Amino acid sequence: MENTLQIQVIYFAKLRDLIGLDREIFSMEEGNNPSDVLASIKKKHNIDIGTNFKIAVNDEFSQWDIKLNNGDRLVFIPLVTGG
């Protein structure tokens, strides 16, 4: 039986504006990664935001396929574009 993880998600900039929150808690299945969390965010908030983000897990830049652990803090950092 898989365990449920509590992941704190922190939003910045455009993502925070779209969602209307600066953070929230997601309950995820053990073995999930940031890509899975992003899919849950898109579904819950009915938004299409792409994947143009850097991510940090527990204040360390990370990869999208890293396995998350209970209590992790996941931050989505929008990439700045312009010229």
Briefly describe each language-model feature range.
Residues 1-82:
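Ubiquitin-like/PB1-type beta-grasp interaction modules and other compact soluble beta-rich domains
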